């Protein structure tokens, strides 16, 4: 998934629905025709319609609804895409490197009160009529998307996901925690005591110089915030996690008031999804959430940090360093962030002065530039590989000189036209993608209509 698609994940709340009092023939004529009973202020299965609109890029009618009892947000995008999708997402902040959100993501789909089978999730993936079924943990949220060509099947998957999220078996079965998180293993009396577990093993395999450099860079740029933590969990920290911590985390954040539900595609009976959601949400009372970062201490002067990464003896270390240079863009407005996003594209272009200057100064180095928006403040991040620790000053001078040249001379119209053409084509092809509904699981919780357009 591209960084641009992941832009702005840190808010969460708004949605839609369609009450089907229309005749089936009318629905067949237009899958996205809005019901006259979906006017703003209408209440359907405990959800109040708060916004109606259109998403022309996807040829979709949009509706945002809010659950009257809990404040949970539901977002419908109704169009003629038969690859229908359902998703529920929660803001799941990080406070350490144990990987608790990741472990719970795995444990969630290990069975629930209504579906008490640890193997059901995999049976559904491989033996039922779905086109996508998964879950994912990101820096600021955990999301549970599923897609199907059958609306009836999608409704059943939604029921499975909702019960799994709100009534997981892990509360009663510690073995699920031990299986997914970590446990001690002893193959024989003479064997050494080892640690195993699905998430522990997964994160051992995912550990790399590049990922370590990324987390260390964000920790230095945003000290005290969630940005420096590994959402998947650090293998050295995962064994300090307890079963009680995982249960407490679920109690704290898996709540309807902290959720965004998205339903996408040729949905003929939105009311059925609303009835299902109302059943899942109604046992809860409204709850306020505060995702401020009181421990965040903004940097006020340049910070330099060198981190070591262990490698096997004999590993080639020449030109093997990864360097991050990050510029915090404090209080950048949304418009300014859009400009910065375009700037990073221009600087990353193979014909840019930055790339050209770097090739001359450090022939083995590669560089990329992106706008980071998941942190407390937006930041422009330069990432260089294929260099040595002693080359940092040369890299810094290349960046400064290139940005200054860009500011003084601008960019050629040919390059602007090429990028504009590329973006236009990318946008035009978006509606042809097969996983549009699944990708919508990455939108913000606070303003889904606007965030869907950004994505």
Predicted features by range, described:
Residues 32-42, 107, 111-298, 319-324, ...:
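Charge-rich, well-structured scaffold segments of protease-associated domains
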Residues 78-120, 124, 334-347:
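Active/ligand-binding-proximal structured segments within catalytic/core domains
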Residues 10, 28, 77-83:
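A short, sequence-level motif marking secondary-structure junctions
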Residues 20-32:
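Sec-dependent signal peptide cleavage junction
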Residues 11-21:
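Bacterial N-terminal signal peptides
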Residues 38-80:
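N- or domain-start disorder-to-order transition segments that initiate the globular core
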Residues 61-69, 303-314:
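Short acidic-hydrophobic surface loop/beta-edge motif
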Residues 2-13:
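Bacterial N-terminal signal peptides that target proteins for export
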């Amino acid at each position: 998934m591209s960084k641009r698609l992941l832009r702005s994940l840190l808010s969460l709340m708004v949605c839609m629905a369609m009450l089907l009092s229309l005749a089936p023939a009318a629905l067949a004529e237009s899958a996205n025709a809005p019901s006259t009973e979906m006017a703003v202020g209408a209440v359907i299965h405990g959800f109040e319609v708060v916004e109606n609109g259109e998403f022309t890029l996807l040829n979709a009618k949009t509706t945002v609804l809010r659950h009257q009892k809990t404040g949970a947000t539901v977002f419908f995008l109704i169009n003629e895409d038969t690859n229908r999708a359902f998703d529920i997402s929660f803001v799941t902040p990080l406070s350490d490197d144990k990987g608790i959100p990741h472990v719970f993501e795995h444990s969630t789909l290990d069975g629930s009160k209504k579906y008490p089978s640890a193997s059901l999730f995999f049976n559904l993936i491989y033996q039922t009529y779905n086109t996508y079924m998964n879950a994912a943990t990101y820096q600021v949220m955990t999301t549970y998307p599923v897609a199907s060509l059958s609306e009836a099947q999608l409704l059943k998957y939604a029921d499975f996901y909702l019960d799994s999220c709100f009534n997981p078996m892990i509360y009663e079965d510690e073995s699920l925690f031990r299986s997914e998180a970590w446990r001690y293993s002893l193959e024989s009396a003479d064997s050494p005591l080892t640690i195993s577990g699905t998430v522990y093993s997964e994160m051992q395999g995912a550990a790399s110089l590049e990922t370590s450099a990324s987390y260390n860079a964000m920790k230095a740029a945003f000290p005290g915030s969630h940005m420096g933590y590994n959402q998947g969990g650090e293998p050295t920290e995962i064994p300090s996690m307890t079963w009680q911590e995982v249960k407490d985390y679920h109690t704290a954040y898996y709540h309807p008031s902290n959720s965004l539900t998205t339903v996408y595609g040729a949905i003929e009976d939105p009311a059925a999804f609303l009835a299902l959601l109302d059943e899942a949400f109604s046992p809860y009372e409204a709850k306020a959430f505060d995702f401020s970062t009181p421990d965040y201490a903004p940097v006020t002067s340049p910070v330099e940090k060198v981190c070591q990464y262990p490698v096997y003896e004999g590993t080639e270390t020449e030109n093997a360093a990864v360097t991050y240079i990050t510029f915090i863009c404090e209080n950048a407005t949304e418009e300014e962030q859009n400009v910065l996003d375009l700037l990073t594209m221009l600087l990353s272009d193979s014909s840019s002065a930055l790339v050209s200057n770097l090739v001359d100064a450090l022939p083995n180095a590669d560089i990329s530039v992106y706008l980071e928006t998941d942190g407390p403040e937006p930041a422009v991040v330069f990432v260089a590989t294929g260099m040595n620790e002693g080359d940092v000053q040369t890299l810094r001078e290349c960046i400064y000189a290139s940005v200054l040249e860009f500011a003084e001379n601008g960019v050629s119209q040919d390059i602007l036209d090429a990028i504009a053409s590329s973006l236009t084509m990318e946008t035009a092809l978006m509606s042809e993608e097969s996983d549009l509904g699944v990708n919508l699981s990455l939108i913000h919780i606070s303003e889904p209509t606007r965030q869907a357009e950004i994505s």
